[in-house]
Amino acid sequence: MTTRPTPATGLFAAALLATCGMLQASPAKAASQDALPAPVQVPAGHKVAWETVGTGDITYECRAKADAKDQVEWVFAGPKAVLKDRQGKQVGTYYGPPATWEAADGSKLTGTQVAVAPAGAGNLPYQLVKANPAMGAGALTGVAYIQRTALKGGVAPQTPCTKAGQRSQVSYQADYIFWKAD
């Protein structure tokens, strides 16, 4: 048995081809800062150079309060995280102190905090860091700012600490966006 195309089949095929012709790869969308608080927005004249997702732990240590030496509290001691690209491939690490971002290619940098802003209950704050010049050539060369966004977790434990020197690790996740000058 032989089947023959009908006029409706021809119209469907023409419409399908026309639709396929309109589907083009769209250019990569620039990271938008519109939803971020003004203090942690990167100044104009910069563009996104690298986007990573950091997952790891924040370590807190029980230390004497500055204004009450007979009392103790949780104090930020440092981060340790794996940095992955948007496809899930490990591309670096983040650790401290001092806060250090290190790419898999060996380039690394430190920075100075410029601003923070609340990122919701139970989450570390948004953060804007001014990068120091990178050590070693690679992905981090020329980075001017690092932005911490899309935060999940990482705040100090809710249970009070009881003994100086006690440590606790809290898991967190954040996007680290690296910006270079235009």
Where are these regions (language model features)?
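Primary mode marks residue(s) on the alpha4-beta5-alpha5 output face of response regulator receiver
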Residues: 31-59, 66-182
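Bacterial N-terminal signal peptides that target proteins for export
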Residues: 2-13
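Intrinsically disordered, low-complexity segments enriched in proline/serine/threonine
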Residues: 7-9, 29, 45
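Bacterial N-terminal signal peptides
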Residues: 12-21
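Sec/Tat signal peptide C-region and signal peptidase I cleavage site
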Residues: 23-30
